[in-house]
A protein has these predicted regions:
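Interdomain helical connector at the RecA1-RecA2 junction of SF1/SF2 helicase-like NTPases
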Residues: 1-52, 69
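Conserved helicase motor "Helicase C" RecA-like lobe of SF1/SF2 P-loop NTPases
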Residues: 63-86
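Conserved helicase motor
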Residues: 87-94, 128-130
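Conserved motor-coupling elements within RecA-like helicase/translocase cores
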Residues: 96-122
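A short beta-strand element within the Helicase C-terminal
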Residues: 136-147
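Conserved SF2 helicase motif VI
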Residues: 152-165
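Conserved small/polar residues in nucleotide/adenosyl-binding loops
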Residues: 170-171
Length: 172
């Protein structure tokens, strides 16, 4: 806490960055955000595009994508939702003592992610540096971004929502 107004040893911006980082790395932050995502998806999104709308969650890294996948999957199950999530990332990650990859978490090979996401019950795609460029899914209607995006990455990522589908309204 800054006690002297002109303290040269205190950098307000650096302190804010550190505090934000501390809050963001807490598991409770992911759980709370996952709750907002699931609630918003069910109340505002799932009935769009004639009841076929999909959503993408853009995570900052693989660990965060796995945390989102687990939290969102648990919340969907708890509310007895007819929908499921898919996670997409490259490689493997050791998380809480277990090594995971896409196939282990999703229950099907990575090569089937795009095909599976086009059909129910899969409605939420959680990604870490994957499917953010060159991915064309007209049913993708909403994007939840939990990652800093700038310049061309922002344009490329958000352009995933700019695909033509009759009666499509996009949320960001």
């Amino acid at each position: 806490v800054k006690t002297v107004e002109n303290d040269p040893l205190f950098d307000k911006k650096q302190a804010q960055r550190i505090l934000r980082y501390y809050v963001e790395v807490q598991k409770v932050a992911v759980k709370e955000k996952a709750g907002v995502i699931v609630e918003h998806f069910h109340s505002e999104v799932h009935n769009k595009i004639k009841g076929q709308a999909r959503a993408m969650v853009v995570a900052s890294n693989i660990k965060r994508a796995v945390e989102y996948y687990m939290a969102i999957s648990r919340l969907l199950e708890e509310r007895k939702s007819p929908y499921k999530a898919i996670v997409a990332f490259t490689g493997e990650i050791k998380y809480e003592g277990v090594t995971y990859n896409e196939a282990k978490l999703n229950g099907f090979p990575s090569s089937q992610i795009e095909k599976k996401f086009r059909k129910d019950p899969y409605r939420l795609l959680i990604v870490a540096n994957k499917f953010q460029t060159g991915y064309d899914e007209p049913l993708l209607q909403t994007m939840y971004v939990d990652k800093g995006l700038s310049d061309i990455k922002a344009v490329q990522t958000l352009s995933r929502l700019n695909r033509c589908y009759p009666v499509s309204y996009t949320h960001l």
